[in-house]
């Protein structure tokens, strides 16, 4: 049956097949929820066509193959790097060749930091080369490096209790991994807290749920009025080893060398493409992922997958000849890893039209097998999204959970626009996150097919509804 559906929808231009009539007064909907449910249910055949094309049809594995071509040939795409700008230009050409509309680049200014050469060696109690990855925005060491005794702590509280021991030392954090959102504070704030008690540098246990001797990088933040000290992540294994040594009273000495340097901000671009709406072209449903990555691995998982299923969503809709009532806009963000820099500048440029944004969507937590969406919005909007997700019952992907926030869409969500993030299986995500292991080997083409289908169905149906999602 699915192949019959695909053959029918693949051969004609569907334009907008979901039915719906607005009954509004002073901008307030007078439709009952049952009427809205009927409108969404009328999109069932379109949803099946998208699923069949993405998962079983000629488009299967396309997002995976497109992604592999980019990351294998360009590699990692650090903010401020030539690789990132090369990738942006390639994507600009790709989106044009794909037949999408209003393809353009929106200029932004982004940070430019480079890690340079870096090394760490344990000198006492034995010689041991320590794998490190400097953290984004860290300063470097003097050319001769920093050689100092180590103080190992497991928390900020312990650091405060032992503050008198920290001066002139390298602080090593061996904090337990609870979850990413709770543990990442040691990466972002570890240098500042160590500097406050007089440390010369900080080394932080990688924020990872599993390790095969692999350090994980990421952004860190300095604080005005606090001395800047070099900071890097080390492996889980080395952090635990030094913690065991310290518990036995063994003196540890490390020599740390880091060539990290921050350069003036540089030019970059957010990459934009659309399928212009047939009835309300000024209104927008936004789908997105970020094109930049860290400078290790390939940035395939974070966030090549999210960027490419967002492109694939528009490709699927275009291939089926669909044109929703309002505009579907793809944005591939730049400099997300530095704190959503490109996304903030996009918001500043476009917030004048905030009343026309129905839904902002971001995929930046992997493209493993999805189970649904995370959503932030009014109760009425959530109820509507639950009906939209029911169209994905053929894939058994219907969950709508809370917390749809994402770094690049938070600006809109905080201003009241409904937001959604892809909900998928994160079991392996932090094995590879911000590490040399983030390569195409992590990616699964079949899982990407399903993720793209979810992304396309949700974005299309919301864009084709007669009315925008209700806000709080």
UniProtKB/Swiss-Prot annotation:
- Class of the enzyme per the UniProt entry, highest EC level: hydrolase
Gene Ontology molecular function terms on file: carboxypeptidase activity; metal ion binding; metallodipeptidase activity; protein homodimerization activity
**Where is the secretion signal located?**
1-20
The record's annotation in InterPro entries points to: CPQ, Peptidase_M28
Q: Which domain of life is it from?
A: Eukaryota
| Tissue specificity annotation | Mainly detected in blood plasma. Abundant in placenta and kidney. Present at low level in muscles, liver and skin fibroblasts. Not detected in brain or white blood cells (at protein level).
Q: Where in the cell is it found?
A: Endoplasmic reticulum; Golgi apparatus; Lysosome; Secreted
Sugar-bearing residues?
61, 179, 353, 356, 396
Q: What is its EC number?
A: 3.4.17.-
Q: What family, per the record?
A: Belongs to the peptidase M28 family.
- How does this protein assemble? Homodimer. The monomeric form is inactive while the homodimer is active.
Name of the protein in question? Carboxypeptidase Q
Q: Which species is this record about?
A: Homo sapiens (Human)
Give the encoding gene's name: CPQ
